[in-house]
């Protein structure tokens, strides 16, 4: 373990995607790069300022997603690409699909914000896969974060089935985590509700709206013929030390994958952003410096050390690519952030009951 820690200190960046949550946390062995921390903190400040100036046409954007109508998008895409460069938002790998890169993804929470207790909200996330849900024109479609439609079904979401889709403008767009085990879409965030876009609304308002409106849709949390998958809202909590300790001691109706930390003022911006942070529960004590209770969620798993090995292997393959010796294996690792889950699978999983094989694609 000591050798791995020393090797890790050689450099911080594990990928082309800064602090991607698909790779292991850079501070698992108490390693911390001052430059990286300052950079993440500074990028947060800049993004909060720039989002005040950047006002996109989210009404048309939501309509295009709902109606699958992309007429005249070529010129707008060029303009958006320039805006993303100015905003320092990583929209990920370019894919020939209109529904790709529509979700707001997180970075590993490396720099502890000075206003964590006042300006941040935490959401406990289940094991599952991130899904873009579009309910429109009497059907509900589920897309992966790469833009592939993996399922189409009726639902009791506004616009999600022929009975409740009264007008063409009655559509809904949600950011969800799909649990195959529970046959449930856990609703993480809302981008559009009944044709009203919420992209440029602050996180605390989006969450308030979401948890006010979801219970109003009768039968949405039940599995029926008209609603074959349950839709359940994920609760959010304050980020004070007392609140975090209470959250980590709770029992949840699902297998917990990790914690998403949202800045209250951030707008919903597709692509990865430092205004949303990701931690596994057992990292809270080391990274945030919070005294946590001894419970299953805070117990360090046996694969924690393996994550360090993944960092070293990924650094090695990346270095080979830079040197012009990119092997097929290294090339595969080069897309680590897009293809792997929040915690890598073990080649030989540790002998531990109920070890999560498939964690959230975050």
Swiss-Prot record:
- Show the segment(s) annotated as Interaction with m3G-cap structure: 128-130
**Phosphoserine PTM positions:** 75
Q: Where is this region: Disordered?
A: 1-40, 69-90, 319-362
Regions of biased composition (Basic and acidic residues) lie at 332-342
Give positions of region: Necessary for interaction with KPNB1 and m3G-cap U1 and U5 snRNP import receptor activity.
1-65
Region span, Necessary for binding to the m3G-cap structure: 210-330
Name the record gives this protein: Snurportin-1
* Any Gene Ontology CC annotation: nucleus
- Point out residues bearing the modification N-acetylmethionine: 1
Q: Where in the cell is it found?
A: Nucleus; Cytoplasm
Molecular-function GO terms, alphabetical: nuclear import signal receptor activity; RNA binding
Q: What does this protein do?
A: Functions as an U snRNP-specific nuclear import adapter. Involved in the trimethylguanosine (m3G)-cap-dependent nuclear import of U snRNPs. Binds specifically to the terminal m3G-cap U snRNAs.
For biological process, the GO terms are: cytoskeleton organization; protein complex oligomerization; protein import into nucleus; protein tetramerization; RNA import into nucleus; snRNA import into nucleus
Q: Which Pfam families match?
A: Snurportin1, SPN1_m3Gcap_bd
Q: Which residues are tagged with the site Interaction with m3G-cap structure?
A: 106, 145, 278
**Stretches assigned to the IBB domain:** 11-73
Q: Does the keyword Transport apply?
A: yes
Location of region: Necessary for interaction with XPO1? 1-160
Record's family? Belongs to the snurportin family.
Instruction: Name the residue ranges with Acidic residues bias.
Output: 69-89
Comp. bias intervals (Polar residues): 12-22
Q: How does it assemble?
A: Component of an import snRNP complex composed of KPNB1, SNUPN, SMN1 and ZNF259. Component of a nuclear export receptor complex composed of KPNB1, Ran, SNUPN and XPO1. Found in a trimeric export complex with SNUPN, Ran and XPO1. Interacts (via IBB domain) with KPNB1; the interaction is direct. Interacts with DDX20, IPO7, SMN1, SNRPB and XPO1. Interacts directly with XPO1. Its interaction with XPO1 and binding to m3G-cap U snRNPs appears to be mutually exclusive. Can form homomers.
Question: What keywords are assigned to this protein?
Answer: Acetylation, Cytoplasm, Nucleus, Phosphoprotein, RNA-binding, Transport
């Amino acid at each position: 373990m000591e050798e791995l820690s020393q090797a890790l200190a050689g450099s911080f960046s594990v990928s082309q995607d800064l602090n991607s949550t698909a790779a292991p946390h850079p501070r698992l062995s108490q390693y911390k790069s001052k430059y990286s921390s300052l950079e993440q903190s500074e990028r947060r400040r800049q993004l909060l300022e720039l989002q005040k100036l950047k006002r996109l046409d989210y009404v048309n954007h939501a309509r295009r997603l709902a109606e699958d109508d992309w007429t005249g998008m070529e010129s707008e895409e060029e303009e958006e690409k320039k805006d993303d460069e100015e905003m320092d938002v990583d929209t990920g790998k370019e894919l020939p699909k209109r529904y790709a890169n529509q979700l707001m993804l997180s970075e590993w929470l490396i720099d502890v914000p000075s206003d964590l207790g006042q300006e941040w909200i935490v959401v406990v996330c289940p094991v599952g896969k991130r899904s873009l849900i579009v309910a429109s024109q009497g059907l509900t479609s589920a897309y992966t974060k790469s833009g592939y439609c993996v399922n189409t079904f009726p639902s009791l979401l506004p616009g999600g089935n022929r009975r409740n889709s009264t007008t063409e403008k009655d559509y809904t767009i949600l950011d969800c985590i799909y649990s195959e085990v529970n046959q449930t879409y856990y609703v993480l965030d809302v981008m559009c509700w009944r044709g009203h876009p919420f992209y440029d609304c602050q996180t605390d308002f989006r969450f308030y709206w979401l948890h006010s409106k979801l219970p109003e849709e009768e039968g949405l949390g039940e599995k029926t013929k008209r609603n074959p998958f349950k839709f359940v809202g994920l609760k959010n909590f304050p980020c004070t030390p007392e609140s975090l300790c209470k959250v980590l001691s709770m029992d949840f109706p699902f297998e917990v994958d990790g914690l998403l930390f949202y800045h209250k003022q951030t707008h919903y911006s597709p692509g990865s952003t430092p205004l949303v942070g990701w931690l596994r529960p057992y990292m809270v004590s080391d990274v945030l410096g919070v005294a946590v209770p001894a419970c299953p969620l805070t117990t360090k798993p046996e694969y924690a050390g393996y994550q360090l090995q993944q960092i070293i292997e990924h650094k090695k393959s990346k270095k080979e690519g830079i040197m012009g010796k990119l092997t097929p294996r290294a090339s595969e690792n080069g897309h680590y952030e897009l293809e792997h889950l929040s915690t890598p699978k073990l080649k030989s999983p540790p002998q531990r009951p109920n070890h999560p094989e498939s964690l959230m694609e975050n």
